[in-house]
């Protein structure tokens, strides 16, 4: 997503909310974003007391730059590592390196891959929304589930016709 769009959205959220408890920078893979430092600084300028986290599968942490490590420490950012089964044995050395650099780390062991539950009948749409409770910000909208923003890509690229709609809120209206 475009940095200026995200910046505008964060500034707008600051106008609406005096504080946001937790903000997670997610992906894809946020460590692939060459502007990650800019995002961290901008978010902390607008929400200095928020619990800011970078959510990653950890693969790229072994090559994390000194500048990014400094930014993470200076801005009190936590690294949330989602450890998937194929990566369990590779994470110990990476986590050790981060902790030696005084980086706060949260480990979530993912025991198995979970499929995205999409069915055309959607017998329990409220349950689906309740179970997908991570508020997402994208291009001026808030939604309670990231599928609202990604389902069209899934449909277009995999020739599916899932009709997964839910309310999303325009933060500019």
Each language-model region and where it sits:
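Conserved alpha-helical substructure of the radical SAM core
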Residues: 1-54, 62
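Acidic (Asp/Glu)-rich catalytic clusters
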Residues: 12-17, 67-75, 97-98
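A general structural motif
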Residues: 18-22, 49-51, 74-76, 102, ...
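A cross-family glycoside hydrolase active-site/sugar-binding cleft signature
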Residues: 24-26, 53-57, 80-82, 108
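Short beta->alpha connector loops
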Residues: 30-31, 57-62, 83-88, 111
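Non-cysteine beta-strand/loop elements that form the S-adenosyl-L-methionine
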Residues: 75-87, 105-110
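Basic phosphate/pyrophosphate-binding loop/patch that engages nucleotide-derived ligands
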Residues: 90-107
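Accessory C-terminal segments flanking Radical SAM cores
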Residues: 119-173
